[in-house]
């Protein structure tokens, strides 16, 4: 069994601030009340930091998956943009958080299996 499955180590609806942050950064639009970008980034990094490093990439993937169902995308936004930006959230210039790869890095979120 994969212990990074949503509902175990990863919450069922993970990283709410990161979802908003991804949309703001990748699409330039806001969902819900407009929170200043640095505040949103801080909240997102804090949510990610609470997760074990092994499951951080998987949590980002789960957050994106949950957005794909029942989520209205604006014409200015593309899943491609979100998929490209999402894995960079753990990187040095963003949250700088270690992952299962032992450094601040996630593979492209569509590229790995469910263990990431």
UniProtKB/Swiss-Prot annotation:
InterPro entries: Allergen/soft/tryp_amyl_inhib, Allergen/tryp_amyl_inhib_CS, Bifun_inhib/LTP/seed_sf, Bifunc_inhib/LTP/seed_store
Sample GO molecular function, one term: serine-type endopeptidase inhibitor activity
Superkingdom per UniProt: Eukaryota
Matching SMART domains: AAI
Function: Alpha-amylase inhibitor.
Family: Belongs to the protease inhibitor I6 (cereal trypsin/alpha-amylase inhibitor) family.
Protein name stated in the entry: Alpha-amylase inhibitor 5
Organism classification: Eukaryota, Viridiplantae, Streptophyta, Embryophyta, Tracheophyta
């Amino acid at each position: 069994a994969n212990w990074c499955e949503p509902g175990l180590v990863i919450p069922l609806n993970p990283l709410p601030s990161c979802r908003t942050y991804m949309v703001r950064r990748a699409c330039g639009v806001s969902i819900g009340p407009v929170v200043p970008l640095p505040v949103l980034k801080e909240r997102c990094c804090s949510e990610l930091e609470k997760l074990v490093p092994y499951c951080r990439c998987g949590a980002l993937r789960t957050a994106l998956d949950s957005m794909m169902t029942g989520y209205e995308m604006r014409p200015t936004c593309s899943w491609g943009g979100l998929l490209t930006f999402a894995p960079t959230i753990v990187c040095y210039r963003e949250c700088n958080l270690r992952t299962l790869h032992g450094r601040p890095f996630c593979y492209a979120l569509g590229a790995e299996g469910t263990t990431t």
